[in-house]
A protein has these predicted regions:
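Amphipathic N-proximal alpha-helical interface segments
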Residues: 75-110, 152-197
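N-terminal leader/targeting segments
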Residues: 21-98, 104, 195-196
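Positively charged, low-complexity intrinsically disordered regions
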Residues: 4, 40-43, 50, 56, ...
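Long, charged/polar, surface-exposed segments that mediate recognition or autoinhibition
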Residues: 86-153
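C-terminal motif of bacterial Sec signal peptides marking the signal peptidase cleavage site
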Residues: 16-19
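Positively charged n-region of N-terminal signal peptides that target proteins for export
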Residues: 1-4, 8-9
């Protein structure tokens, strides 16, 4: 019995030492997006620990989520908001979303605003004719001139959101970016919205 306990203790010590090791997290650079999260930056192990299966699964999910969103959106250099870390992702039909959580307990809407500005510029560079619009089923679309035209604050919940549409490869895509007032989580959603023909 003592041998079994000693063996179990030794295995636990080895596993805990392995879990404590691994790559050190490096701080992200300044700016609104972290290029280390782009598709090109997903080849390494990043900040995950090799001995922790859950961490590795999250890293794989992270890389796949970025690839899915990049492919759907045409925005090949999507990064993460500065001061944020990957939290999770999901899909519903063809719609894809990625969530980011603040790296610290404090957060501000400035992070959302800066990230929205970076995505706005990427969409302008990607969109047909460089136009970001308010999509209407009637076909009479409003072209947004300024990022501030797409920003909405929901007074009852404190939620801040940006929404715009853009045309890519003959299809309208809806981009929504929102931040929870409770925990600061930022969610980016890309949704196919119908043919532009």
């Amino acid at each position: 019995m003592k041998r079994i306990l000693a063996l179990l203790l030794a295995m636990m010590m080895v596993l805990s030492l392995a879990a404590c090791g691994g790559n050190k997290e490096t701080p992200s650079g300044s700016g609104t997006t972290d290029p280390g999260t782009s598709q090109q930056g997903q080849t390494g192990s990043g900040t995950t620990k090799k001995a922790d299966g859950a961490q590795m699964d999250a890293a794989t999910d992270h890389a796949n989520s970025y690839t899915d969103v990049q492919t759907l959106s045409g925005l090949n250099t999507i990064g993460k908001p500065a001061g944020y870390k990957y939290k999770g992702s999901g899909e519903a039909g063809e719609t894809r979303h990625i969530r980011f959580a603040p790296e610290t307990d404090s957060f501000t809407v400035d992070s959302l605003d800066s990230y929205a500005a970076a995505l706005w510029n990427l969409c302008i560079d990607t969109a047909k004719d460089g136009e970001l619009i308010r999509y209407r089923l009637s076909g009479e679309h409003t072209v947004y001139e300024n990022l501030s035209d797409t920003r909405k604050v929901y007074e009852d919940s404190g939620l801040v959101a940006y929404v715009w549409w853009y045309e890519l490869n003959g299809e309208y895509l809806r981009l929504q970016l929102k931040q929870s007032a409770d925990d600061g989580v930022i969610e980016l959603t890309i949704e196919p919205y119908g043919s532009a023909e």
